[in-house]
Amino acid sequence: GVVTLNCARLGYQYAGNEAGLLAAVDNLVALGVDTLERRRAFVTEQLRNGLYPYTRRWLPSLDNHFSTIGVNGCNEMVRNFTHDAYDITDPRGKALTARLLDHINSLIVAAQEQTGHLFNLEATPAEGTTYRFAKEDRKRFPDIIHAGSEREPYYTNSSQLPVAHTPDPFAALEHQEELQSKYTGGTVLHLYMGSAMSDGKACAKLVRRALENFHLPYITITPTFSICPEHGYISGEHPHCPHCDQTTEMWTRVMGYFRPVESFNIGKKGEFHERQYFSETYV
């Protein structure tokens, strides 16, 4: 199971009070650990009772499986914490986020020792949670700072940079290296490109430079493309076909997988509309 912390709300509720924020994290992680332990016990019981016969054939127990604590909205946490004086792109905002992740990791180590079960810290993909957290918080706290617009609110994924921060992929890699290395579970930096790269050699060069010079666990190269009913694949973001002006179906990655933009939830559409693509010219 996965429990995700709403870091943006924490930044709002404990603005300027880091000790209070971390104390609240203590309580939330403790609640998360208790919830995940109950879930593990329930699923284990059902496994033993034969409710997962195919799983049981290959998986005698869940002892080697992790329970996960994740984070979402660290950029908005910093913005709310500082009354929008700066965000995660500022060294002070990045340092605050690093301290948060270190603190959660220490709590996870204690949880493992206490329970005897495996726990990890993950950059939760949060395909729907980025929007749901922001939507629910706006109902409770109308003046809370969020990304996107009033119509399309969302929180920035995990401890990622704001989606419109830079077109330079190496600037993003440099900023994210320290933060993403702190996760003990899943984390990835998606390099959203505005279109297909010029050729395979350019793509290979980008991947090689990224992996040789930085220590991020995972990266993806994510081009945006469009599909015309008449002319098929078109590289890049084209709401209408440049050949026949028909409405196209635009595709890009929504975290772990590619989907048509039209099927995105409201928050993810807001993120898509705000995104500044990384540029191949920096490679």
Spans of model-derived segments:
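Long, C-terminal-biased catalytic regions of enzyme "large/alpha" subunits
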Residues: 1-283
